[in-house]
């Protein structure tokens, strides 16, 4: 076998499910051909040669990390709301007074796709320096048919400019815009549902999301949105049960949803539905921390039910101003009780599943994309242990060094 690139003297954490949690192969090699993993195994069994061979001097190799829930495309600043929350005002109060998402909507509507993409690129660079190779980016700060499409075009532009894989999610049902105040159902019918059809037809969105909450959209409105998404051939996911138990996790599982995200208030019925549907529970400790919440997601119950759990930054200008996936993983361990292998799976294997990309990325397996992160650490646990340190040696995406 002739490889394009052969990595030798490596320690691999393949993240294929196994007894040690990491799928470790010591004294290993990995062969790449045509941007994909062509062979993995012990160095003593390398089945061919390569045009380029690189010795990694016992460095660890993992799948490139995946941030499966972000709001990286936006304009404007909401640091004053941070000050208001520090003064004791709740996020719900700020939102109802015209702040929160509505503030970002005003600024984002005034920006073009190029400006939005340029801002997102500065944020995505911080993730790249931590070994991230795939990022999900949501719309949701436009809330008109044209401005939401502008946000999705910006996300596609980020993919082209950054070299990273971007999964674009239509989140028009993020908040009710001012011009539809008190008429959320009419907004769903007149803006969100037609927009789903347009985004699917134009190839702008890979999935549809909604914010199902008392300050967002009702379960009935979310259901109408999901019916339209499925009819358009787009998978669904949901901001579910963050501030109250709305039955969101159960609802998105009913539609075979990719993920239920936040899920602090998800009940036993919702967990059972997620387990049955294979819906991933996405933990967002950055928002939990920034909002000073006390209700933790039901990690132990999801673990017992066999629900796959992912970890993401929820990077956004208001409730989770976090562009460090490694910090999010650290928080998920300390605040929510994930084990280190669970947190690592949450940034790789399970994050890929939350995006519907588990056949392409998330583990080191023959046939998958050669998206790799190489680390200067003694053990994989060290990658998550430290806050603020970036132990990344380098990234390989689609078989090429970045």
From Swiss-Prot:
The keyword Hydrolase applies. Pathway: Amino-acid degradation; L-histidine degradation into L-glutamate; N-formimidoyl-L-glutamate from L-histidine: step 3/3. The gene is hutI. One of its GO terms (molecular function) is zinc ion binding. It holds the Pfam family Amidohydro_1. The keyword Protein transport does not apply. Zn(2+) binds at residues 69, 71, 239, 314. Binds 1 zinc or iron ion per subunit. 4-imidazolone-5-propanoate binds at residues 78, 141, 174, 242, 319. It comes from the Bacteria. This is Imidazolonepropionase. GO terms for cellular component: cytoplasm. Keywords: Cytoplasm, Histidine metabolism, Hydrolase, Iron, Metal-binding, Zinc. The lineage of its organism: Bacteria, Pseudomonadati, Pseudomonadota, Alphaproteobacteria, Maricaulales. Its cofactor is Zn(2+); Fe(3+). It comes from Maricaulis maris (strain MCS10). N-formimidoyl-L-glutamate binds at residues 141, 316, 318. NCBIfam families: hutI (TIGR01224). Catalyzes the hydrolytic cleavage of the carbon-nitrogen bond in imidazolone-5-propanoate to yield N-formimidoyl-L-glutamate. It is the third step in the universal histidine degradation pathway. One of its GO terms (biological process) is L-histidine catabolic process to glutamate and formate. It catalyses: 4-imidazolone-5-propanoate + H2O = N-formimidoyl-L-glutamate. It is found in: Cytoplasm. Fe(3+) binds at residues 69, 71, 239, 314. Its EC number is 3.5.2.7. Belongs to the metallo-dependent hydrolases superfamily. HutI family.
